[in-house]
């Protein structure tokens, strides 16, 4: 092996190249690689954060849907309860109105009965007076009295 000037020249060129690469090319290259690695790490962190936020948002949506369903069911139950209460109130009002009408009809029937009795009493009194007049006008005769009483019975 001959160590000649070309080997030394190649070694000098290699060290100069190494020094140029180490001084001017390697730092920007390392910086670019570090920036790229940082961007990738930031992107992965952002993806993880986005994934966590998505899961949280999904939980919130599920919770909101559950609350909305529960609220809707509660509103339906309240509406049904109000409808039932209204129906019961209407039934009670109708029953009260029916009872009032029945009581009024009974009172009117009672009044008509009383009026009819009074009218019959008046008619009976008139007929009794007429009968007494006829009896007094005629002679006292048992057969005539019986006929008049039968005639009065027929008129009553």
Swiss-Prot record:
Which GO terms of the cellular component aspect does the record hold? plasma membrane; proton-transporting ATP synthase complex
Q: InterPro entries, alphabetically?
A: ATP_synth_B-like_membr_sf, ATP_synth_b/b'su_bac/chlpt, ATP_synth_F0_bsu_bac, ATP_synthase_B_chain
One Gene Ontology molecular-function label: proton-transporting ATPase activity, rotational mechanism
A Pfam entry, by short name = ATP-synt_B
Which of UniProt's keywords are assigned here?
A: ATP synthesis, Cell inner membrane, Cell membrane, CF(0), Hydrogen ion transport, Ion transport, Membrane, Transmembrane, Transmembrane helix, Transport
Q: Provide the membrane topology annotation.
A: Single-pass membrane protein
Subunit structure and binding partners: F-type ATPases have 2 components, F(1) - the catalytic core - and F(0) - the membrane proton channel. F(1) has five subunits: alpha(3), beta(3), gamma(1), delta(1), epsilon(1). F(0) has three main subunits: a(1), b(2) and c(10-14). The alpha and beta chains form an alternating ring which encloses part of the gamma chain. F(1) is attached to F(0) by a central stalk formed by the gamma and epsilon chains, while a peripheral stalk is formed by the delta and b chains.
- Say what the protein does: F(1)F(0) ATP synthase produces ATP from ADP in the presence of a proton or sodium gradient. F-type ATPases consist of two structural domains, F(1) containing the extramembraneous catalytic core and F(0) containing the membrane proton channel, linked together by a central stalk and a peripheral stalk. During catalysis, ATP synthesis in the catalytic domain of F(1) is coupled via a rotary mechanism of the central stalk subunits to proton translocation. Component of the F(0) channel, it forms part of the peripheral stalk, linking F(1) to F(0).
Q: Which family does the UniProt entry place this protein in?
A: Belongs to the ATPase B chain family.
This chain belongs to the protein called ATP synthase subunit b
The gene it comes from is atpF
């Amino acid at each position: 092996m001959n160590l000649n000037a070309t080997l030394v020249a190649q070694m000098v060129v290699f060290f100069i190249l190494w020094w140029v690469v180490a001084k001017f090319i390697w730092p920007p290259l390392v910086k670019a690689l570090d920036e790229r690695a940082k961007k990738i790490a930031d992107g992965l962190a952002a993806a993880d954060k986005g994934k966590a936020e998505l899961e949280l948002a999904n939980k919130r949506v599920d919770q909101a849907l559950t609350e909305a369903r529960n609220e809707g069911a509660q509103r339906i139950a309240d509406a049904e309860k109000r409808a039932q209460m209204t129906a019961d109130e209407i039934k009670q009002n109708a029953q009260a109105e029916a009872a009032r009408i029945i009581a009024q009809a009974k009172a009117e029937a009672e009044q008509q009965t009383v009026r009819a009795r009074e009218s019959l009493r008046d008619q009976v009194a008139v007929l009794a007076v007429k009968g007494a007049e006829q009896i007094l006008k005629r002679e006292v005769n048992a057969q005539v009295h019986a006929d008049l009483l039968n005639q009065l019975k027929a008129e009553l």
